[in-house]
């Protein structure tokens, strides 16, 4: 290139043969796709042990409760949603001080 601006005459293209290791992959290979029944995910029923640490549900209490559960992945996710939603756990001291309808 001579000068500050590029002109078409300054560009030289060199075409070479494609190397065998960089040939495109044949997308129409003999691979078979699974049918719809095989693609349905089966629920994972494997149970795993978890340690859950949650705060006491009383406003003035700072006790951390430890709960050990054995649950599936779906079960622990459901439990997590309960704990972050309307369900609150109480420590033994706060349970004795609260009025409740159960025994």
From Swiss-Prot:
Keywords: Activator, DNA-binding, Early protein, G1/S host cell cycle checkpoint dysregulation by virus, Host cytoplasm, Host nucleus, Host-virus interaction, Inhibition of host innate immune response by virus, Inhibition of host interferon signaling pathway by virus, Interferon antiviral system evasion, Metal-binding, Modulation of host cell cycle by virus, Oncogene, Transcription, Transcription regulation, Viral immunoevasion, Zinc, Zinc-finger
One GO CC term on file: host cell nucleus
Residue segments, region E7 terminal domain: 1-48
Domain of life: Viruses
Quaternary structure, from the entry: Homodimer. Homooligomer. Interacts with host RB1; this interaction induces dissociation of RB1-E2F1 complex thereby disrupting RB1 activity. Interacts with host EP300; this interaction represses EP300 transcriptional activity. Interacts with protein E2; this interaction inhibits E7 oncogenic activity. Interacts with host TMEM173/STING; this interaction impairs the ability of TMEM173/STING to sense cytosolic DNA and promote the production of type I interferon (IFN-alpha and IFN-beta).
Motif Nuclear export signal: where in chain: 76-84
Zn finger intervals (unnamed): 56-94
Motif extent (LXCXE motif): 27-31
BP terms from Gene Ontology: DNA-templated transcription; symbiont-mediated perturbation of host cell cycle G1/S transition checkpoint; symbiont-mediated suppression of host innate immune response; symbiont-mediated suppression of host type I interferon-mediated signaling pathway
PTM description: Highly phosphorylated.
Written domain comment of the UniProt record: The E7 terminal domain is an intrinsically disordered domain, whose flexibility and conformational transitions confer target adaptability to the oncoprotein. It allows adaptation to a variety of protein targets and exposes the PEST degradation sequence that regulates its turnover in the cell.
Family assignment from sequence similarity: Belongs to the papillomaviridae E7 protein family.
Function: Plays a role in viral genome replication by driving entry of quiescent cells into the cell cycle. Stimulation of progression from G1 to S phase allows the virus to efficiently use the cellular DNA replicating machinery to achieve viral genome replication. E7 protein has both transforming and trans-activating activities. Induces the disassembly of the E2F1 transcription factor from RB1, with subsequent transcriptional activation of E2F1-regulated S-phase genes. Interferes with host histone deacetylation mediated by HDAC1 and HDAC2, leading to transcription activation.
InterPro entries associated with the record: Papilloma_E7
Keyword Transcription regulation applies: yes
Transcription as UniProt keyword: yes
Stored Pfam families: E7
Compartments, as annotated in UniProt: Host cytoplasm; Host nucleus
Location, primary (coarse class): host cell
GO terms for MF: DNA binding; DNA-binding transcription factor activity; protein domain specific binding; zinc ion binding
Protein name: Protein E7
